[in-house]
Every structure is written in C-alpha cells, then in structure tokens.
C-alpha cells in the first residue's frame, strides 16, 4: 500500500457507495472476507467477489464469521475482515467480538443498521430487525465508526486505520439505504502506522539495572510484546549474563525453545518443577506481558519479591499487581540496554538449568483414554511445521502442556473471554492462511456442539485441518468445580456420543478413537487433499487439569 495513494477514479453517475466501499477494501489490501450474508450486506459481498477478486468464505453463524477473522488476524498479523447483516446478525457476533478485542486482534466488522427505517415501509428490516448497534457496543467499550453517505469510503479507511494502529476490533456500521446512493470523492489512503514507543526513562532503567544486579535467583518472563519486538535473543543473553531462568506466557511459548534455562510457561500451566523454581526466585523480570493473575497464580509468584516490569503500554503496570520497577519502552530495546548495563556490574554467574519435568501415570482404561497420553501421541504423530489451536474447556491444558510448541505462535489459545466454542472458525481461517502448514484444533465436545456449523467451512473448502475432539461426554470444567465445591456431579455428565458420525455426516473424514493405539491408523487413513479429519477421542474424566488448581 502506497502512502497517500488515492483509491479509484472520480465517481461517475453510476458509482454507488457500496461499489466504492468494495473498491476501498480492495485498495486496503483485503484478500479474504469472512461472512454470513444477509439482506444488509449481500451487495458488498457480491462486489468484493466479482469486482475485486476477494476470496469470500461463508460461515454458518455470525459468531464464526468474526471468529474466523480473528483467527486470520492472529496468524497473518494483518487485518481480519468480516461482515454480517443487521439486527440478530449483528447481536450474534458479540462473543467473538469481545474475544478478538481482548486479544488485541486487528479486526474490522462491517454490519448494516436498519434501525432508521420506517417499520411501515420496511416491516421486517425496520420493524423486526431494527437495532442500533451502538446500544450494545458502547457499554462494551468496542469502538464504532459509522458510515455517512457522502464520506463512507473515507470512514472505512478510518476504521481500518484504527484497527491497525490500536490493534483492536473496530465495528463499521453502514445504515441501510445509503449503499445505493451516489458515492462521494474517493479517499486518500495512507498506510497505517503503529503508535511509536517512547524511549525508556533513564531513572527507571537505572532502577531496573540495580534491582536485577542485586538479585541472586532471577527469572526472566517474556510475553507477546517480547515476541513482536524481536526481544528473544536479547533476553537469552540477559539470562545467561545474570544466571536467570527463562519463562514465557502462552502467547510467547517457544521463544526460548532449546535454551537450557527455559522453564516453559509461567502460571497455571507451569509444571510442578518449574513452579518450584519460580517460587524460590527473588526477582521477576517481566518483558512484554501484562503479568496477569493467571501468570502469577493470583499474585503468588510476585508477592515478596522484586518485580521489574517492562512494557510498551503504561497501562500494563497498573492492570494487575504493581511492580517494584516499571520501565516503559520497546521490549527489545530495553532488554538490550539492560544487558549492556549489567555486563559491567554482575560477576560471573553460573548458567541456570531448568529442571526436567516429571512424567505421569497413564490412567487410560478400555474405551476411555488419558488426555495426556492422547496429547503426547499426537505430538509424535502430527507433522511439522504445525500450528495448534486450543479451544476453551477443561481439556485445554493437556495439549498445551503435553505437546511441543517450538516457536511463538505455534500454539494459538483463545481464552480472552473464556467462551467455549471460540476456536473452530479461527482454526479454519488459520488453515486457509497457511496452506503449507498443518493446522490442528483441540476442542471439547461441548465446544463442538456449540459451533458444529463452523466445520462445514473446512469441509466445503477442503481445508487440511485436523480436528481433535476431546470428548469426555460431560461439562468438564463444571465437573472440576463441582468436585471442589462439594456439589454432586450428575448434572454435568451427558454421556459419550459418536461425534465422528456427526462430522462424517457433514462431509468430513472422521474416526472414533477409544484407545491411544488407534490414533496412528486413523491419521494414516486421512487424505488431506479431500478436506478435514475429525478425531472423536473419548477421554477419561479422571484426569484433572492443573489449571483448575489456580483459577
């Protein structure tokens, strides 16, 4: 995209607002669109597909359309575009909108608004489906850009710019009826620029250096901001210099792969051995992470020790526990400065070595597999490079903790709103975005029941997606809570259904797997060129996810 380039030609008598919106989206670099069409957006979808060669991916639920755009944005780093119709089409998107926004995914949702129509003249669109989207979006804190007939294309450019610069969801609202009006002048488009990060304060930097230099058992924790700034090598050098152990959040997992000091994930998914190391630390150096209550096990990992917190966003320092020293700045730049300053202040220190995680006793029984054993076997069987998507639910900790995620982004977990069923559409979009990699989704039976229609996209477009349904025939999270709260469990147990048959009925290749040895032959029988493979894995309810000890 060229800075300052004008889109299209001066409008002619036949150029409409909707045609200009489609041209603007194409000029902004839109290659893929995720949608569930309705009366309010079908013209836009038509013009994008036929006039601009945009690949249109049709979902069967509006929440899936937004979820797919979110997945696309997470994998590509580009704006995810999605569109739905007015009224109930819009309200169906709210869960996915909050998930994407809390993940800081740059997503633009285009929705129509029929609330301004006369119910007499348009009894369905105006009377039945009429709803002002801002009535719901404003209380949720989701930004809205409303199109005006004379400036609609320029308004869309504004929505796109905000999504990129603020790294969040923006909802672009198009009032029904303006789409067929004559378009105004085409807008100029400048490539959006991320907000600049300030140089670190010298006094804060000096305080951080002093705190780290005086520590004897430091742990360096990297988050998403460290990944995005390319801080990995500088943080490895900092750890080697100070004798620190290394750890990451889930979104940075794999950043320190192969380093002997790497403890893996900090927080609820820490191994017992890693948690013991962090519990003995006297200084936590958190770089590019919010250091939220999951990371710190409800403050246990930060209480009574020095915390040096480095982030580009000053809001990170007050969102959770207050750090001892806060340094605002780019993660890589600050890490390099810390290393340079500490090189002359710390004596020779022994390199930290992470403890070897312990194993587990496989509790698989006839017809019911240990979910840890399933994860370990699939880690061995599934090809690389791969990207593993994990939905929400009790099962999620097992593929996160018992599979290898060897680079940042190779694990995509969607916990931001805690919504079951967030990942199926996202994983399908990821498979679209990375045709040369292997996309693998782990989802529970409850999540699959909620979003089963999203599988149809993968079937129709023949996406080589592996869907692993961790089917415990129950509401697994609620079982864990019921046990903790001494509530009888029978209301959370539903029984094991043959979900492979359901997936097969939708056109997927599928296998019911009830023993770990059955995974290999099921995958051998899969033809990736023919579309997705659905593995209905019947797992035991007797293995508790360690995350539930800390939530």
What do these predicted regions represent?
Residues 18-29, 36-39, 44-49, 353-436:
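Active-site diphosphate/adenylate-binding microenvironment
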Residues 106, 118-131, 318-320, 326-328, ...:
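Thiamine diphosphate
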Residues 175-180, 357, 366-370, 374, ...:
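A short, charged, Gly/Pro-tolerant segment at domain boundaries
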Residues 112, 287, 310-312, 390, ...:
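Active-site flanking residues adjacent to catalytic metal/cofactor-binding acidic residues
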Residues 159-160, 206-209, 235, 273-274, ...:
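Generic recognition of flexible, low-complexity loop/linker segments
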Residues 7-8, 139-143, 191, 353-368, ...:
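Short glycine/proline- and acidic residue-enriched helix-loop micro-motifs
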Residues 2-342, 384, 464-467:
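N-terminal alpha/beta PP-like core and its mobile active-site loop of ThDP/TPP-dependent enzymes
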Residues 168-171, 345-354, 534:
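Flexible, glycine/charged-enriched surface loops at secondary-structure junctions
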């Amino acid at each position: 995209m060229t800075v300052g380039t004008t889109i299209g030609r001066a409008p002619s008598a036949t150029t409409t607002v909707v045609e200009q919106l489609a041209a603007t989206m194409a000029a902004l670099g839109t290659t893929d669109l995720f949608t569930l069409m309705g009366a309010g957006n079908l013209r836009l979808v038509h013009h994008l597909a036929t006039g601009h060669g945009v690949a249109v991916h049709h979902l069967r639920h509006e929440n899936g359309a937004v979820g797919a755009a979110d997945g696309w944005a997470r994998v590509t780093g580009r704006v995810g575009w999605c569109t739905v119709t007015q009224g109930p089409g819009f309200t169906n998107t709210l869960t996915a909108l909050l998930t994407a926004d809390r993940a800081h995914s740059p997503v633009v949702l285009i929705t129509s608004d029929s609330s301004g129509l006369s119910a007499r003249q348009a009894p369905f669109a105006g009377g039945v489906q009429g709803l002002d989207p801002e009535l719901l979006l404003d209380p949720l804190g989701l930004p809205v850009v409303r199109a005006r007939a004379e400036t609609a294309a320029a308004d869309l450019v504004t929505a796109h710019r905000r999504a990129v610069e603020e790294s969040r969801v923006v909802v672009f609202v198009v009032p029904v009826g303006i789409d067929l009006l004559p378009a105004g002048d085409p807008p100029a488009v400048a490539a959006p620029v991320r907000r600049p990060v300030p140089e670190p304060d010298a006094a804060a930097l000096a305080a951080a250096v002093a705190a780290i230099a005086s520590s004897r058992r430091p742990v360096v924790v990297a988050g998403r901001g460290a990944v995005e700034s390319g801080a990995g090598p500088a943080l490895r050098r900092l750890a080697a210099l100070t004798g620190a152990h290394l750890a990451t959040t889930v979104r940075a997992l794999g950043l320190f792969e192969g380093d002997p000091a790497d403890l893996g994930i900090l927080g609820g998914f820490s191994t017992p051995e890693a948690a013991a190391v962090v519990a003995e630390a006297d200084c936590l150096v958190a770089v590019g992470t919010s250091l939220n209550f999951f990371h710190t096990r409800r403050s246990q990992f930060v209480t009574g020790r020095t915390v040096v917190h480095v982030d580009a966003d000053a809001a990170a320092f007050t969102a959770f526990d207050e750090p001892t020293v806060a340094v605002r700045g780019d993660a890589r730049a600050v890490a390099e400065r810390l290393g340079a300053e500490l090189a002359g202040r710390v004596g020779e220190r022994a390199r930290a070595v992470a403890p070897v995680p312990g194993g587990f006793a496989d509790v698989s029984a006839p017809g019911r597999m240990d979910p840890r054993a399933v994860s370990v076997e699939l880690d061995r069987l599934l090809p690389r490079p791969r990207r593993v998507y994990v939905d929400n639910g009790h099962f999620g900790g097992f593929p996160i903790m018992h599979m290898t995620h060897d680079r940042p982004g190779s694990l995509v977990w969607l916990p931001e709103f805690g919504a079951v069923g967030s990942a199926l559409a996202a994983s399908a979009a990821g498979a679209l975005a990375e045709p040369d990699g292997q996309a693998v989704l782990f989802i529970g039976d409850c999540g699959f029941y909620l979003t089963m229609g999203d599988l149809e996209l993968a079937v129709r477009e023949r996406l080589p997606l592996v869907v692993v349904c961790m089917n415990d025939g129950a509401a697994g999270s609620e079982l864990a809570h019921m046990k903790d709260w001494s509530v009888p469990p029978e209301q959370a147990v539903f029984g094991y259904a043959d979900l492979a048959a359901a997936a097969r009925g939708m056109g997927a290749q599928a296998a019911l797997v009830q023993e770990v040895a059955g995974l290999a032959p099921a995958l051998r029988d899969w033809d990736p060129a023919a579309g997705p493979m659905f593995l209905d894995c019947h797992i035991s309810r007797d293995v508790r996810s360690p995350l539930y000890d800390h939530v």
